[in-house]
Swiss-Prot record:
Might take part in the signal recognition particle (SRP) pathway. This is inferred from the conservation of its genetic proximity to ftsY/ffh. May be a regulatory protein. This is UPF0122 protein MYPE4850. It comes from the Bacteria. InterPro entries: RNA_pol_sigma_r3/r4-like, UPF0122, UPF0122_fam_protein, WH-like_DNA-bd_sf. Pfam families: UPF0122. It comes from Malacoplasma penetrans (strain HF-2) (Mycoplasma penetrans). Belongs to the UPF0122 family.
């Protein structure tokens, strides 16, 4: 699987984080957003560094599988792009109206 950047992980957690166990979610949050190392998370949870690494890897895979099946983020981004195009078109319409009004005033 491809490596995810922080914004992608953030979206996955926002959309699907509640589908993970509390421990999985907390490990992801600690690692990616609280900037804790694997060793620090392991020490806080009294488990091995390898266990935390495996948990984070498994959790990311689960989040990606949720997205692959449900496509919530894909649909969200699609809607966002459509809204942006509508907004841009409305702005273009307003600019054209203003130009037409200016042309009528100058005649």
């Amino acid at each position: 699987m491809k490596e995810l950047d922080l914004s992608q992980i953030s979206l996955l957690i926002d959309f699907y984080g509640n589908l993970l166990t509390d421990k999985q979610l907390q490990n992801l949050i600690d690692y990616y957003f609280n900037d804790l190392s694997l060793s620090e998370i392991a020490a806080n949870n009294n488990v091995s560094r390898t266990a935390i690494h495996d948990s984070i890897k498994k959790s990311k895979n689960e989040l990606e599988q949720f997205e692959n099946k449900l496509k919530f983020i894909y649909r969200f981004n699609l809607r966002k792009e459509i809204y942006k195009q509508i907004k841009d078109n409305n702005l273009l319409d307003q600019l054209l109206e203003t130009e037409v009004e200016q042309l009528w005033k100058t005649k």
